[in-house]
């Protein structure tokens, strides 16, 4: 993954600094209002003062504990596990990496205050993940507009 290739690289420090800047200078939120995720093995490399305690594993489900968080950083670019993908493919099941990725991201974002209809700040540094979210919003909006006709 990107993290493995760059773990001793300036890019990890850049991601940490950008995340720190997002929470401190852009959203200006308190630590208790922040929620963020990355791969668990890289959490300590990215964690920063003022948001470290807001870490939540990206695959956490069925919790309302973070519903008061208004600033979210999704520091992942998700793909199917290659072994799982190969298993499904070999058994005739089509796997859609993009559908999987947007589903995972939406599940994570849903842990925040957005579940109560509140506005939240989103930081998604991966252009792929950001574009998937924008496409999903646009497609969902089009469907709702069609229903109103």
Predicted features and spans:
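Positively charged, amphipathic N-terminal segments that serve as targeting/anchoring signals
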Residues: 1-57, 71
């Amino acid at each position: 993954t990107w993290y493995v290739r760059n773990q001793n690289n300036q890019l990890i420090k850049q991601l940490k600094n950008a995340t720190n800047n997002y929470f401190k200078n852009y959203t200006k939120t308190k630590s208790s209002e922040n929620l963020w995720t990355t791969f668990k093995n890289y959490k300590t490399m990215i964690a920063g003062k003022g948001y470290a305690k807001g870490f939540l594993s990206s695959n956490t489900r069925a919790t309302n504990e973070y519903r008061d968080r208004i600033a979210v950083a999704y520091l992942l670019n998700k793909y199917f596990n290659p072994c799982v993908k190969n298993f499904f493919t070999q058994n005739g099941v089509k796997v859609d990496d993009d559908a999987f990725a947007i589903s995972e991201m939406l599940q994570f974002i849903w842990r925040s205050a957005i579940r109560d209809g509140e506005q939240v700040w989103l930081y998604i540094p991966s252009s792929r993940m950001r574009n998937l979210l924008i496409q999903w919003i646009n497609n969902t909006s089009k469907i709702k507009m069609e229903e109103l006709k």
